[in-house]
Amino acid sequence: MWNEGWMAAAAIAVFGLAGCVKGMVGLGLPTVSMALLAVFMPPAQAAALLLLPSLVTNLVQMRPVAGLRPLLQRLGWMQLGIVLGTLGGVALWGGVGSLPAARPALGLALVMYALWGLSGLRWQTPAPHQAWLGAACGLLTGAITAVTGVFVVPAVAFLQSLGLSRPALMQAMGLCFTTSTLALGAGLLWQGQGLGAQAQEMGLGLGLGLGLLASALMLIPALAGMHWGELLREKLSPELFRKLLMLSLLVLGVYLCF
């Protein structure tokens, strides 16, 4: 049986590993964390621990700040679409887990996209169509986020089609994931499914305050792992980086299917 000491040590190790994956390929912290934490704690407790590490690592990924303005000018409509799609999805369907068939269907789509990406085929979105396609992609990403809690589809595919440099792609993913996290958090808070509710489900009398404290403590291993992952990423060739990103999406897709 897991006692509290072993659970804390295991959670620290999980967030360190998840942060490393995040630093290397720009995504995967929620997936790795939830998959491994579920081995020794309830999903509600795992989700509560994940809140701040997910948000803060996405904010860190958005640096450097100087590059945000041109990125926002290019992706502003997409961010608006993400917010509207997420809030609308929560209002219409009731939030994450409300449509059980959505997760495996999304997983299958993600597997197909990852296999296509690993084949070496690529496409680019023409500049005149990037604004409206970005808004449409944002709406769809937001709607999918609302019912599955997954931010990457089809946002990552669209961002890859823009022909961004590797640093710009990492920053763009950080921006989109931050927008999605905040929008989903706002929607769940509105529906009464936020961190305080999760803490109450876990039987924690201190509710929101204790949940935030536990989540804040997991920031240390997550950020340390992310820094190490970023150092490893600098040693990767662009082609190897792209393959690792596609493999990460493939693993995420398989995880969602089951």
Task: List the model feature ranges, each with a label.
Residues 70-82, 103-107, 128-138, 168-175, ...:
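Cytoplasmic-side transmembrane-helix entry/capping segments in multi-pass membrane proteins
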Residues 58-69, 90, 96, 105-130, ...:
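Transmembrane helix exit motif
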Residues 13, 17, 52-59, 76, ...:
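Hydrophobic residues within alpha-helical transmembrane segments
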Residues 46, 88-93, 143-150, 184-187, ...:
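Hydrophobic alpha-helical transmembrane segments in multi-pass integral membrane proteins
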Residues 48-99, 182-238:
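Selective hydrophobic functional segments
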Residues 42, 97-98, 165, 237-241:
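A helix-boundary/kink motif common to multi-pass secondary transporters
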Residues 7-8, 13, 37-55, 100-110, ...:
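Structural signature of hydrophobic alpha-helical transmembrane segments
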Residues 1-40, 123-180:
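Selected transmembrane alpha-helices and immediately adjacent juxtamembrane segments
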